[in-house]
Amino acid sequence: MYPPEFSYVRAESLQEALKFLEGNDNTRPLAGGQSLIPMLKLRVLSPDYILDINRLNELNYVKTSLNGVSIGALTRYHDILSNDIVKSKVPLMHHATRTIGDMQVRNMGTIGGAISNADPASDMPVVLTALNATIILSSASGSRSVKALDFFKGPFTTDTNKGELVTQIEVPVLDGYKTVYKKVVRRAGDYALASVALAIKLKGNEIEDIKLAYGGVHDKPFRAMEVEKNVIGKKLNDDLVKDIASKVSSQINPPSDHRGSSWYRREVVKVLTMKAFKEVA
């Protein structure tokens, strides 16, 4: 299907992009296009303007900061995957990025585009929710920060106001944590039927801290905060893991579609949870 008609505008600087967004409501920024182009072809979106931001090199970086690791919104998955800072300081993000799409998607797709699209089955929103990352949104009048847990509001819906653009992601460094990312897909390159991102800090075999998030099984990334709170201080063993898997499965609200039923996704979550904990035990 052909996309609807729109006007194409290319920004040469961040300030130019923000000024344009401020004055033109029905505008969609174009970064890698891996999410936007398919949605245009399906006519899910019908913007008046497409704002090409690919020349905004000031949004393409990975660097250490006081808050951990800062990543520019235009940083492509390929660059995240090959970056030594991400490998050493945010291994959960590195592991998840390896599983995203195929080489074309990783070469073109950007972290900012993925989280702005907010597909509940997408990989990066789940990772950022588990890591308690912060999203920086900029507009012509200034910037503000939103926790990932609050940024994703529902399917393809975020806490982005008129005239705002995602410009940076700040990811805490979790020293002393073991991390793992797992997902089930129908075929290579697909969005996840279900996914789990786990970061856990152990003292011996006792859980000192835990962060547990799921994708593809709720209307947005699901952070199992009630489960997290209840298992801190407990010894990690098979019985506890089975209990965690069962409780998470009862708390999620998976969709049923052509890729899998709600029941099937709940069962997948149980299996993924047990596999994730087995890997970090």
Swiss-Prot record:
Cofactor stoichiometry and binding remark: Binds 1 FAD per subunit.
Please classify the protein's predominant subcellular localization into one broad category: cytoplasm
Which cofactors, by name? FAD
GO MF term list: FAD binding; flavin adenine dinucleotide binding; glyceraldehyde oxidoreductase activity; oxidoreductase activity, acting on the aldehyde or oxo group of donors
Question: Which key words tag this protein in UniProt?
Answer: Cytoplasm, FAD, Flavoprotein, Oxidoreductase
Which catalytic reaction applies to this protein? D-glyceraldehyde + A + H2O = (R)-glycerate + AH2 + H(+)
Q: Which domain of life is it from?
A: Archaea
Q: Does the keyword Flavoprotein apply?
A: yes
> For this protein, what is the EC number?
1.2.99.8
Matching SMART domains: CO_deh_flav_C
Q: Name one GO cellular component term.
A: cytoplasm
Protein purpose: Component of the glyceraldehyde dehydrogenase which is involved the nonphosphorylated Entner-Doudoroff pathway. Catalyzes the oxidation of D-glyceraldehyde to yield glycerate. When the artificial electron acceptor 2,6-dichlorophenol-indophenol (Cl2Ind) is used, the enzyme shows a broad substrate range (glyceraldehyde-3-phosphate, formaldehyde, acetaldehyde, propionaldehyde and isobutyraldehyde), but is most active with D-glyceraldehyde. It is not known which acceptor is utilized in vivo.
Query: Subunit notes for this chain?
Result: Heterotrimer composed of a large chain (CutA), a medium chain (CutB) and a small chain (CutC).
- Kindly give the PANTHER family that the UniProt entry links to this protein: XANTHINE DEHYDROGENASE SUBUNIT C-RELATED (PTHR42659:SF2)
Q: Protein name, please?
A: Glyceraldehyde dehydrogenase medium chain
Per the UniProt record, the source organism is Sulfolobus acidocaldarius (strain ATCC 33909 / DSM 639 / JCM 8929 / NBRC 15157 / NCIMB 11770)
